[in-house]
């Protein structure tokens, strides 16, 4: 057989990169600027036995390549790359180590931790400067040539506009492991997420875009395995083109199973966004294993210390950092992104530690090579691009600094909203966050949707834990409860953790509604953490990255137990869809429209009057209203159907506040749509109030009113503007 393979070898082409089957054979292409020889290793179907090593015959523009006739999908392979082993010069070539193809689309076998995986001899004098001659192939996963054919039928991307986007962040495994409608054999898999009952539920929430935690092939950290834990979240990538085998039923159908899931989501009108980790790899620092990039071309792929190239720049906190200033690294990342869009049909990406991607030799640059590559790319520039705009390096915090076309996680929104609802942030701090954080994003023609607003995410407390714990409880992570954020801006409402106190539980439930309502009534793009809609808990663990168990898995029994909260979320998303003024494509203007004498946004105090300067500087200003008047539309072309007028009242005081309803005419009437103190306010119920009437706003609650155009008999016509009503605002339950 080896003689047959060698006889079918042709010179091939340098592009496309990776293993590309053209129907007659497979072209193998691998970039390495400093290698002296590259061997293609072919294995049996299970990846257990090496059949032959074939030296790639050609080297063009720093790319090694060759073509094998009659080798196609299902062929199992890896690489051995020869070159200098000079760690102090940044080179770590070791042909004894079988390497993963950076462009591999599928894998067979699993990584089994062994000292042979390391390019140096562990424990030997000289540490990583030594050279290890053991063969790592028995312990390595192997690459598989993939068949890209797939019948998408009529499935197409829903192309949800940014202004209608509501993101729902979840984890493939955690979301399905305990779902009663998912067959046991599908749990934890892409196919489980594609079960009709799962998709129907997600769709019913009113969200538009499902953001999946990393699905690229990743490695479980050895230190975690030694503790009986795993790298559950998956932020430890080793293959940027391959779906992780853990999430597929048949490892030889990984690409197809992922595509089937995407097709089912698209058929339901839901987008699929991937959380991607292009900032580092699973190979760690100089003491990490040699699995792929480190052995292919360490000097080119990684950022090394300028004066000590033995060591890695660690702006990620994981041991290494990909060099996104190198053209071939940029090419690999953009090739990967295009693959997931064009071949796998995903609709966007959230970039973990996104600042890394824009780092040039002198630091962050919003005109970096990678960002410019995305901006000009006809494929990537049309999908959703979301940055986590920080990293661990110097000058790493860059919220608001990404270029036009990008959205960004807005941690200032998260922190300020959390502070407000525990009484620690006044109106002056909350107001900018409510109208799209214009102070951060209103530049370069960016739109309010550039602000990804969130209260909770995978990293940190769940919503239920945010209102139930003052302190992290990460003992299960086996790091002496020292990992995870120490300052969470959380408030347990009086008791730490679960309680039987009815008053505490009622306050917690109201606080959760306050957070959800604030999120879905704010300008910008809202993101919900899966399970928050029914009060999922992680038992106070705010860093469950290593918990592949009940701590992280969604408990679906809570969906029935807390059905009222689920219904509240559905009501809020429906209101956001109904009122375009809540999701404007332009930043709201506080300037008066001279033609009609109205402002798009007016901030009002509890007296129903516009807030005065001294109130803006009052650190105790915890009750105020945001009046959104769609009739003004002070900027841009006037949009039909955008002329609703809404009043949102926020009260973070402990006590009830009488709030006088404002109006621009004696006939102004307000319909109560939401009172977070009344979780079961009937959807069809109409409680209507006149301008000047006072509504008793319960302590720590939020109200939403809409301006009524028609007369309703429920209005107390004896009221005068500014006079308080003796009628109860609504039935308290």
Residue ranges and their predicted role:
Residues 27-29, 165-166, 208-211, 269-271, ...:
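Beta-sheet entry/capping signal
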Residues 30, 79, 170, 202, ...:
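Conserved, mostly hydrophobic/aromatic
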Residues 53, 179-196, 469-474, 682-691:
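Short, polar loop/linker segments at the starts of domains and inter-domain junctions
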Residues 75, 83-85, 174-175, 179, ...:
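A generic secondary-structure signal for well-formed alpha-helical elements
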Residues 83-151, 222-230, 235-236, 268, ...:
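Core domains of carbohydrate- and sulfate-ester-processing enzymes
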Residues 345, 360, 366-530, 535, ...:
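Conserved alpha/beta catalytic core and glycan-binding cleft of carbohydrate-active enzymes
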């Amino acid at each position: 057989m080896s003689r047959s393979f060698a006889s079918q070898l042709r010179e091939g082409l340098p592009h496309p990169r990776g293993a590309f089957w053209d129907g007659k054979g497979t072209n193998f292409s691998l970039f390495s600027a400093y290698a002296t020889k590259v061997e293609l290793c072919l294995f049996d179907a299970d990846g257990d036995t090496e059949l032959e090593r074939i030296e790639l015959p050609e080297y063009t523009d720093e790319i090694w390549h060759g073509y094998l006739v009659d080798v196609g999908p299902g062929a199992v392979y890896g690489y051995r790359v020869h070159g200098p082993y000079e760690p102090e010069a940044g080179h770590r070539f070791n042909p004894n180590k079988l390497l993963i193809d950076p462009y591999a689309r599928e894998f067979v076998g699993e990584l089994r931790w062994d000292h042979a995986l390391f390019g140096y001899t562990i424990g030997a004098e000289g540490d990583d400067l030594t050279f290890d001659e053991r063969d790592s192939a028995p312990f390595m996963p192997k690459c598989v040539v993939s068949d890209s054919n797939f019948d998408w039928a009529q499935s197409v991307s829903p192309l949800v506009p940014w202004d209608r986007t509501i993101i729902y962040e979840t984890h493939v495994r955690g979301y399905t492991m305990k779902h009663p409608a998912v067959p046991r054999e599908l749990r934890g898999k892409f196919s489980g997420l594609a079960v009709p009952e799962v998709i129907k539920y997600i769709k019913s929430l009113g969200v538009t875009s499902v953001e999946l935690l990393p699905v690229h092939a990743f490695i479980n950290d050895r230190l975690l395995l030694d503790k009986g834990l795993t790298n559950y979240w998956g932020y430890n990538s080793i293959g940027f083109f391959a779906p992780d085998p853990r999430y597929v039923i048949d490892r030889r159908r990984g690409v197809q199973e992922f595509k089937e899931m995407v097709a089912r989501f698209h058929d339901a009108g839901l987008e699929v966004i991937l959380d991607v980790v292009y900032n580092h790899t699973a190979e760690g620092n100089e003491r990490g294993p040699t699995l792929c990039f480190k052995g292919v071309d360490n000097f080119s792929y990684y950022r090394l210390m300028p004066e000590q190239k033995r060591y890695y720049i660690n702006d990620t906190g994981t041991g290494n950092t990909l060099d996104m200033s190198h053209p071939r690294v940029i090419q690999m990342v953009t090739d990967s992104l295009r693959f997931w869009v064009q071949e796998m049909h995903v609709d966007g990406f959230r970039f973990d530690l996104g600042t890394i991607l824009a780092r040039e030799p002198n630091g962050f640059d919003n005109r970096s090579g990678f960002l410019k590559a995305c901006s000009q790319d006809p494929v990537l520039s049309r999908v959703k691009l979301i940055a986590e705009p920080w990293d661990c390096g110097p000058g790493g915090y860059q919220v608001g600094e990404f270029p036009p076309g990008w959205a960004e996680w807005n941690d200032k929104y998260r922190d300020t909203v959390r502070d407000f609802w525990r009484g620690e942030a006044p109106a002056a701090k909350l107001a900018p966050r409510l109208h799209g954080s214009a102070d951060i994003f209103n530049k370069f023609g960016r739109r309010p949707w550039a602000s990804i607003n969130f209260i909770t995410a995978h990293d940190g407390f769940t919503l239920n834990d945010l209102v139930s714990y003052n302190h992290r409880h990460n003992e299960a992570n086996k790091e002496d409860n020292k990992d995870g954020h120490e300052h969470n801006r959380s408030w347990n409402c009086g008791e730490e953790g679960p309680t039987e106190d009815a008053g505490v539980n009622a306050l917690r439930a109201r606080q959760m509604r306050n957070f959800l309502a604030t999120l879905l009534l704010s300008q910008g793009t809202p993101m919900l953490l899966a399970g928050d809609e029914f009060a999922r808990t992680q038992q106070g663990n705010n860093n469950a990255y290593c918990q592949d168990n009940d701590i992280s898995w969604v408990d679906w029994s809570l969906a029935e137990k807390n059905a009222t909260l689920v219904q509240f979320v559905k009501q809020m998303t429906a209101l956001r869809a109904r009122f375009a003024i809540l999701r404007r494509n332009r930043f709201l203007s506080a300037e008066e429209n001279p033609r009609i004498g109205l402002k798009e946004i007016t901030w009002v105090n509890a007296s129903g009057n516009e807030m005065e300067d001294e109130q803006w500087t009052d650190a105790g200003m915890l009750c105020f209203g945001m009046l959104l008047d769609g009739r003004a539309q002070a900027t841009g072309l006037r949009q039909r159907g955008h002329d609703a007028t809404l009043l949102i009242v926020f009260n973070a005081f402990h006590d009830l506040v009488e709030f006088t309803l404002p109006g621009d005419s004696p006939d102004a009437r307000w319909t109560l749509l939401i009172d977070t103190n009344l979780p079961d306010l009937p959807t069809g119920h109409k409680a209507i109030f006149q301008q000047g009437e006072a509504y008793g706003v319960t302590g720590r609650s939020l109200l939403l009113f809409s301006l009524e155009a028609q007369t309703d008999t429920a209005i107390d016509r004896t009221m005068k503007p500014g006079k308080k009503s003796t009628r109860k605002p609504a039935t308290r339950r």
